[in-house]
């Protein structure tokens, strides 16, 4: 898949773009099967990100692609690696990790405004996350982005349910601006999506989403890639997701050259 120059430019300038039909119908079917397998075999990293009194559940899981052939196929053999290289303007695409996000019908728990990269153990500007639903997603429950928020400031990462600082120490990074209170100052991007569509966004782009309606299930697979300039940013705390033993194998500032993060050298569509 070759992207238009305007799509690449919008990604670089705005920090998020929509990609229509980036997965084929057969790939959507395969991914749906992979999500079902993941939900039936949650990993030790899985968590419920909604509160106990929520009528639905917000389920997350991380880093299962090496044990899930459907996920591995999507990450390696779909159009995603080649699209990632184009968006990142990188000669390489390295798998960083996968992330499952499922909001069951009636889930009230929102996904609060945040950036992804402050939770991670990686530095560099060449990166991309794909947010890929296998269910139709109406605009009101789709992911929202603050345009151009990926260009500078790192904001304080906090837990979703109770806003605790479990990563950077309090005061180490800027607090979130009043995004929803001042919409004119923080223009937003969002798109309704169909299965096969994806949104691609930079790991520093501020994003959030609402809960879902009483009859809506929102099953999403996120695929994350790193480009040429990605480097290991060793942290004195447990990152989200954690990569146990990585600090012993990779020096701080080293390229992300580890078996956990393979380069995708060839792209083949099945």
Residue ranges with predicted function:
Residues 80, 90, 105-107, 136-139, ...:
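Short, charged/polar surface micro-motifs in flexible loops or helix N-caps
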Residues 1-14, 20-113, 119-121, 236:
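Non-heme Fe(II)-dependent double-stranded beta-helix
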Residues 99, 115, 132-136, 145-147:
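Short, structured patches in soluble enzyme cores that scaffold and shape functional sites
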Residues 121-138, 192, 224-227:
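Short, conserved beta-strand element in jelly-roll/cupin
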Residues 116-118, 127, 207-212:
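Glycine-rich phosphate/pyrophosphate-binding beta-alpha loops
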Residues 91-93, 97-98, 109-111, 126-132, ...:
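Generic beta-strand structural signal
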Residues 34, 41, 45-53, 158-160, ...:
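Non-heme Fe(II)/2-oxoglutarate
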Residues 139-206:
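Double-stranded beta-helix
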């Amino acid at each position: 898949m070759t992207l238009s120059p305007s799509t690449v430019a919008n990604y670089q300038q705005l920090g998020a773009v929509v990609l229509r039909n980036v997965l084929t119908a057969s790939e959507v079917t395969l991914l749906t099967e992979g999500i079902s397998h993941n939900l039936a075999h949650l990993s030790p990293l899985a968590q419920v990100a909604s509160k106990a009194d929520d009528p639905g559940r917000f389920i997350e899981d991380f880093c299962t692609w090496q044990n899930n052939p459907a996920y591995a196929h999507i990450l390696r053999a779909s159009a995603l690696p080649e699209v990632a290289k184009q968006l990142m303007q990188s000669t390489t695409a390295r798998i960083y990790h996968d992330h499952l996000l499922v909001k069951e019908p009636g889930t009230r728990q929102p996904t609060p405004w945040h950036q992804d990269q402050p939770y991670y153990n990686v530095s560099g500007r060449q990166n991309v996350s794909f947010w890929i639903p296998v269910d139709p997603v109406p605009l009101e429950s789709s992911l929202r982005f603050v345009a151009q928020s990926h260009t500078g400031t790192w904001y304080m990462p906090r837990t979703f349910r109770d806003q605790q600082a479990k990563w950077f120490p309090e005061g180490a990074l800027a607090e979130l601006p009043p995004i929803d209170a001042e919409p004119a100052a923080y223009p937003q991007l969002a798109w309704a999506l169909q299965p096969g569509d994806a949104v691609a966004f930079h790991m520093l782009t501020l994003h959030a989403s609402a809960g879902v309606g009483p009859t809506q299930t929102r099953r999403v697979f996120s695929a994350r890639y790193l480009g040429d300039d990605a480097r290991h940013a060793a942290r004195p705390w447990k990152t989200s997701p954690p990569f146990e033993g990585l600090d012993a194998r990779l020096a701080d500032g080293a390229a992300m050259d580890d078996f956990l993060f393979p380069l995708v050298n060839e792209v083949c569509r099945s």
